[in-house]
UniProtKB/Swiss-Prot annotation:
Family to which the UniProt record says this protein belongs: Belongs to the enoyl-CoA hydratase/isomerase family. MenB subfamily.
UniProt site positions, description: Important for catalysis: Y97, Y258
Name this polypeptide is given: 1,4-dihydroxy-2-naphthoyl-CoA synthase
Keywords: Lyase, Menaquinone biosynthesis
Function statement: Converts o-succinylbenzoyl-CoA (OSB-CoA) to 1,4-dihydroxy-2-naphthoyl-CoA (DHNA-CoA).
Swiss-Prot/TrEMBL cofactor(s): hydrogencarbonate
Gene3D superfamilies: 2-enoyl-CoA Hydratase, Chain A, domain 1, Lyase 2-enoyl-coa Hydratase, Chain A, domain 2
EC identifiers of the protein: 4.1.3.36
UniProt pathway: Quinol/quinone metabolism; 1,4-dihydroxy-2-naphthoate biosynthesis; 1,4-dihydroxy-2-naphthoate from chorismate: step 6/7; Quinol/quinone metabolism; menaquinone biosynthesis
Example of a GO biological process term: menaquinone biosynthetic process
Any GO CC annotation of this UniProt entry: cytosol
GO molecular function, one term: 1,4-dihydroxy-2-naphthoyl-CoA synthase activity
């Protein structure tokens, strides 16, 4: 018998389209606090080019700073691919992927940082291929919900490429050093169950249930404390994000301190041109 609470979690979602002005992505927001960014290049298995990444970053920033949004979903158009990485047809000879003006970019690295530093949970909703740079994007998301037809793997050494940043180091954190080396050195592909078994994804569902299950997970998170989730994400990232991770964690502590009477006493004293009185605040051991 289904729990009555599940009825609310599985209720139909109402998406509002915010895709105007975008060519490579679709962007939607739900009426209950979920943003969804969809890579919309199914003709190339949702491979990204510089324009795609620019649009993802713009939509992502909008979702981050929208106080009505609590969770962000990243996905690909259709059932054949989440994202197959960088579009090799626009990969140039001078260190990146060429935009329409001929400038070479590796701006997907900026988008990776956006995912890691965003205080809101980011959920990868994966159907079909999550390969190469697309595989790294799903790994960097906080959670991954996979369809049964999902395929995971790296292709870098086959196409003269690699991700020596989070694509290597964070993968090793997820699956262990030996398995990470296997994935990168052999360039094999793994089905959804294999990905689940090695800790690359959180759950596997039939493709027909993929969005419904993803929305359920998002709604469960939306029921919880946003400050707690924000600080937990920063804490979970800090051990492998170096100084940037510590900065994010410390920034959250500063934000919380600003909300306290003690923090506000310092501000008020400065603005009122008087000495602050911190004597009333506890000095806990």
């Amino acid at each position: 018998m289904q729990n009555p609470k599940d009825d609310v979690l599985y209720a139909p979602v109402e998406w509002i389209d915010h895709s105007e002005g975008y060519s490579d992505i679709r962007y939607h927001k739900s009426t209950d606090g979920i943003a969804k960014i969809t890579i919309n290049r199914p003709e190339v298995r949702n491979a990204f080019r510089p324009q795609t990444v620019k649009e993802m970053m713009t939509a992502f920033s909008d979702a981050r700073f929208d106080e009505n949004i609590g969770v962000i979903v990243l996905t690909g158009e259709g059932e054949k691919a989440f994202c197959s990485g960088g579009d090799q047809k626009v990969r140039g000879d001078y260190g990146g992927y060429k935009d329409d003006s001929g400038v070479h970019h590796l701006n997907v690295l900026d988008f990776q940082r956006d995912i890691r530093s965003c205080p809101k949970p980011v959920v990868a909703m994966v159907a079909g291929y999550a390969i190469g740079g697309g595989h790294v994007l799903h790994m960097l998301c906080d959670l991954t919900i996979a369809a049964e037809n999902a395929i995971f793997g790296q292709t870098g050494p086959k196409v003269g490429s690699f991700d020596g940043g989070w694509g290597a180091s964070y993968m090793a954190r997820l699956v262990g050093q030996k398995k990470a080396r296997e994935i990168w050195f052999l360039c094999r592909q793994y089905n959804a169950q294999e990905a689940l078994d090695m800790g690359l994804v959180n759950t596997v569902v039939p493709y027909a249930d993929l969005e419904k299950e993803t929305v359920r997970w998002c709604r469960e998170m939306l029921r919880n404390s946003p400050i707690a989730i924000r600080c937990l994400k920063a804490a979970l990232n800090a051990d492998c994000d170096g100084q940037a991770g510590l900065q994010e964690l410390a920034g959250n502590a500063t934000m919380l301190f600003y909300m306290t009477e003690e923090g506000q006493e310092g501000r008020n004293a400065f603005n009122e041109k008087r000495a602050p009185d911190f004597s009333k605040f506890r000095r806990n051991p």
